Amino acid sequence: MINILEVNETNNMIEQEKLDVRTITLGISLLDCCDASLDTLNQKIYAKITRLARNLVSTGREIELEYGIPIVNKRISVTPIALIAGSACQSPEDFVSIAQTLDKAAADMGVNFIGGYSAIVSKGMTWTDELLIRSIPHALSATERVCSSVNIGSTKTGINMDAVRLMGQIIKETAEATQEQNSLGCAKLVVFCNAPDDNPFMAGAFHGISEADAVIHVGVSGPGVVKHALESVRGKDFEVLCETVKKTAFKVTRVGQLVAQVASERLGVPFGIVDLSLAPTPSVGDSVAEILEEMGLESVGAPGTTAALALLNDQVKKGGVMASSFVGGLSGAFIPVSEDQGMIDAVIRGSLTIEKLEAMTCVCSVGLDMIAIPGSTPASTISGIIADEAAIGMINQKTTAVRLIPVIGKDVGDMVEFGGLLGHAPVQQVNTFDCSKFINRGGRIPAPIHSFRN
């Protein structure tokens, strides 16, 4: 039974500890929009998105006012565009026109991002997939709200090294195409292994083909709440620490579950999942890094960091699963450098390197996220980092991703401003030894032996 103390506790989480619903994401299937005419395809895409999403933003605001729960973003994800545009698109420029249609639909609906300018190439690339991938630099430079993702591997299929090599080049080209904005286009481009179909978070959201025609997903966020809870158990043993994280994650997820159910009912769209991810922001007191330091680390990156993150990730899942009927997406702890003030501080003081971040991705929710690297970094080195991260995901049967930003004209130690939720980041050192001969072999890395479950 709910008592007044729990009500007050939730109010305090929202007012003082930065608890919010990070996103309500409306997933929309565009499979029924396929057409051999590019103009007709664009018209169908725009018409379907605007028909289904016309009340998304207003409904989100109503829920905010009625329940007092901040909902930071209202977003849209769509079917991976490479799957629906094969008949209509004969060149990268044709795909760019679809990106511009998505951008216009997002702007007209009042959402800040639309995801799904994507290709799924974990085993091989069709001609259409390759056209879309090659269009990404132009598409992201010509739009404001479009987010792109490419899935280059999975535990079941292995890693498509041809796609890995190509994505290193595409990230470099995207950085160059948006260099006037500190290579911001790369912040809207994610390379995945084991990408989920129901991720509500950008920039990696797309509406998977296993999903219904339309569905509501919700992503919660409460790093500040978890940190505040841990302040009351300083010096206690690990059992108490784990119990505290688990109970707090339960309460945070319950808020997301409530918002998801209400939004689903009012929009007349099925409820999909709640994503349990602890998503930080650049605001002070809204940091995953500060949670790890509250556990007893002098600075994130110190010995013990990976163990602390593993503990946090696991307890968040255990608490969250009890709080929602349907849990999905990425669900864990995000460690984006530019979006987390604690991570930024750790990089500046020298305790946190890319290599340590890679180790942390073995046990956390996603991967190497929002990391600024020198603009002179070769495409082959970026591909090598993608391959390393994909291997972690493939072998460990988990989602991993890379969102690197080679900032043109910047070098190690320079500070780069991205703005808003994307924050700012110091440019980090990348290992300069060459891996091009390895990357240029081409072909596929086979799936691991434990992927054979039949």
Curated annotation (Swiss-Prot):
Family matches, as InterPro entries: UPF0210
SUPFAM superfamilies, A to Z: PFL-like glycyl radical enzymes
Top-level taxon: Archaea
Gene3D superfamilies xrefs: 3.20.70.20
Coiled coil: none
Entries under NCBIfam families matching the protein: PRK05313.1
PANTHER family with a match to the protein in the record: UPF0210 PROTEIN MJ1665, UPF0210 PROTEIN SPR0218
Family statement: Belongs to the UPF0210 family.
Name the record gives this protein: UPF0210 protein Mhun_2657
Organism whose genome encodes this protein: Methanospirillum hungatei JF-1 (strain ATCC 27890 / DSM 864 / NBRC 100397 / JF-1)
